[in-house]
From Swiss-Prot:
It is an enzyme of class 1 (oxidoreductase). InterPro entries: FAD-bd, FAD/NAD-bd_sf, FHA_dom, SMAD_FHA_dom_sf, Zeaxanthin_epoxidase. Pathway: Plant hormone biosynthesis; abscisate biosynthesis. Residues 1-50 form a transit peptide. It comes from Nicotiana plumbaginifolia (Leadwort-leaved tobacco). Higher expression in leaves than in roots. This is Zeaxanthin epoxidase, chloroplastic.
């Protein structure tokens, strides 16, 4: 069995971007003799993976940035002493990159428990293809451990949906930009696990706990940092990786305010498995001045973020976060409400979202900044941590090049020029992605599904379900620009990763239907492997029971006011006046459910997920979908809500058996 497919093309073919950027599919059953026709064309057996890693390391070791042994006699060489303020993701990744290149590194971290337990506070983090590739270029073994611990989301459907209806607005293809460039596929990983792996790779002897950098002095030859307890340490350069409220930044450029995004964010992790877990990785649910993000994080858990437009500094009532969220998102689709309901109150956290405006000044002298300390961005693209990882690789590379030039020329290491070179190489890319993250928030805050939303006295127009012009026009531009944007964000830094061999992993392969799912919403729904239920939703005092529908095409569900045990299928009795003796039949075919009205007196009615109510045609199968309301009769007493669940509650199965007992 092939475990790794290597990308041998130096210049991958240019993608033909269409309305949907479609993935290149690699199936486990794909004939091995045809692999030469794919971008990723060479393969190795499992036992050769270690050799491959050795090749990557050897390539890095032979790069021009390495000091030739003969040059050591020409110029006395000593390790550069690199001081790093901050032991978050950016600080640790840079420390690892610098250590791998032979530098003497010391990381100052205010609270080592933040490294061990930050994941408990902020939850999992998405590491996209561009950052995973940078990690591979830094240390293949560490990157492999991190990827193995993550949950792959990039080979499933991801994108934007309408928050109320749950209908797809735009799908993102993060798979194609990765495999076409030989990059790892996007993953989500526990922040705590990520930082533990990084801290272990860096080494506890390099990370100083309870060491908060409060000041520094750059005399032109050395940099001396001062800790909160008065201790001082001297090095050849200082890297400020101490977050959005960086003390290093403040000492460099003076105090400056962070920028409030206009949104507060609630976040939580729920023990919950959505019905479409096999086909959908993450979704952004759009609404007017509020939006909701959900992502599979593996292990039967889902992470979510709820953003709401309001002033900063708000405080919730004790144990009131969940109740407030359910009120804010009242009327939204099941995918949102189910996650909120499944989350414990004490697992919900709240924080206001801030960023910093882009700046042209990243450092001075022997001091530079990295990650959030210089370009803190809103989380809407999931690129904040990814940019810090890219920064880390580039900074270590520039320092290594400076050391190599020093060895070749016999001159002192030009640290200052190498820091400015790092900053120049990163400013444009980071600035563009920072702007895109802000634009994503603006789009979310201005999204309106229907004409009349947010218009106060004219809000009655929403009942006519007239699509808002902004939604229609916005979709056109998103469909046009999203493939280009994703291609550049995910693959635009790959050429700078010196020594990294482009490759794909068969373990990251996509379902062979992924191409179809991007184009066909109906095919995506039919692929859902879950149980379909009808939950009582009527205004009757009758004890209606939950119905579990069968996906056996030979086992229809016959609904009437009396039992029909002599008819094939299950008989469901609803003893209400407007339910006819033989009212309707529910059947399953080709991955979808249909209801057929059997010429009942008062009809069978369906209200879809956008609020449109219509009568099913007699003796004609009518398709229904998740979240629809089905009414047997016109008085809304025998009404049921269509619910699709991965694991239906045990009570539902019990009630279903009672409902069909005699049948």
């Amino acid at each position: 069995m092939y475990s790794t497919v290597f990308y041998t093309s130096v210049h991958p073919s240019t993608s033909a971007f269409s309305r949907k950027q479609l993935p290149l599919l690699i199936s486990k059953d794909f004939p091995t003799e045809l692999y030469h026709s794919l971008p990723c064309s060479r393969s190795l057996e499992n036992g050769q993976i270690k050799k491959v890693k050795g090749v990557v390391k050897a390539t890095i070791a032979e790069a021009p940035a390495t000091i030739p042994p003969t040059d050591l006699k020409k110029v006395p060489q000593k390790k550069l002493k690199v001081l790093v303020a901050g032991g978050g993701i950016g600080g640790l990744v840079f420390a690892l990159a610098a250590k791998k290149r032979g530098f003497d590194v010391l990381v100052f971290e205010r609270d080592l428990s933040a490294i061990r337990g930050e994941g408990q506070y902020r939850g999992p983090i998405q590491i996209q293809s561009n950052a995973l590739a940078a990690l591979e270029a830094i240390d293949m073994d560490v990157a492999e451990d991190i990827m193995n611990a993550g949950c792959i989301t990039g080979q499933r459907i991801n994108g934007l949906v309408d928050g109320v209806s749950g209908n797809w607005y735009c799908k993102f293809d993060t798979f194609t930009p990765a495999v076409e460039r030989g990059l790892p596929v996007t993953r989500v990983i526990s922040r705590m696990t990520l930082q533990q792996n990084l801290a272990r790779a860096v080494g506890e002897d390099i990370i100083m706990n309870e060491s908060n950098v409060v000041n520094f002095e750059d005399d032109g030859e050395k940099v001396t940092v001062t800790l909160e307890d008065g201790q001082q340490y001297t090095g050849d350069l200082l890297v400020g990786a101490d977050g959005i409220r960086s003390k290093v930044r403040t000492n460099l450029f003076g105090p400056s305010d962070v920028t409030y995004s206009g949104y507060t964010c609630y976040t939580g992790i729920a023990d919950f498995v959505p019905a479409d877990i096999e086909t959908v990785g993450y979704r952004v649910f759009l609404g007017h001045k509020q939006y909701f993000v959900s992502s599979d994080v593996g292990g039967g858990k889902m992470q979510w973020y709820a953003f709401h437009n309001e002033p900063a500094g708000g405080v919730d009532d004790p144990n009131g976060k969940k109740a407030r969220l359910l009120k804010i998102f009242e009327g939204w689709c099941d995918n949102v409400i189910d996650l909120l309901v499944a989350t414990d109150e004490d697992a919900i956290l709240r924080r206001d979202i801030y960023d910093r405006p882009p700046t042209f000044s990243w450092g001075k002298g022997r001091v530079t900044l990295l990650g959030d300390s210089v370009h803190a961005m809103q989380p809407n693209l999931g690129q904040g941590g990814c940019m810090a990882i890219e920064d880390s690789y580039q900074l270590a590379l520039e320092l290594d090049k400076a050391l190599s030039r020093s060895a070749e020329s016999g001159t002192p290491v030009d640290i200052i020029s190498s820091l400015r070179s790092y900053e120049s190489s990163r400013k444009l890319r980071v600035g563009v992605i920072h702007g895109l993250a802000r634009m994503a928030a603006i789009m979310a805050s201005t999204y309106k599904a229907y004409l009349g939303v947010g218009l106060g006295p004219l809000s009655f127009l929403t009942k006519f379900r007239i699509p808002h012009p902004g939604r229609v026009g916005g979709r056109f531009f998103i469909d046009l620009g999203m493939p280009l944007m994703l291609s550049w964000v995910l693959g635009g830094n790959g050429e700078k990763l010196e020594g990294r061999i482009q490759h794909c992993r068969l373990s990251e392969k996509a379902n062979d239907q992924l191409r179809n799912w991007f184009e066909d919403d109906d095919a995506l729904e039919r692929a859902t492997d879950a149980e379909w239920l009808l939950l009582p939703a009527g205004n009757s005092n009758a004890a209606l029971e939950t119905l579990v529908l069968s996906r056996d095409e030979n086992m229809p569900c016959n609904i009437g006011s009396v039992s029909h045990a002599n008819i094939p299928g299950k008989s469901v009795v609803i003893p209400l006046p407007q339910v006819s003796e033989m009212h309707a039949r529910i059947s399953y075919k080709g991955g979808a459910f249909f209801v057929t009205d059997l010429r009942s007196e008062h009809g069978t009615w369906i209200t879809d997920n956008e609020g449109r109510r219509y009568r099913a045609s007699p003796n004609f199968p009518t398709r229904f979908h998740p979240s629809d309301i089905i009414e047997f009769g016109s008085d809304k007493k025998a009404a049921f809500r269509v619910k699709v669940m991965k694991f239906p509650p045990k009570t539902a199965a019990k009630e279903e058996r009672q409902a069909v007992g005699a049948a």
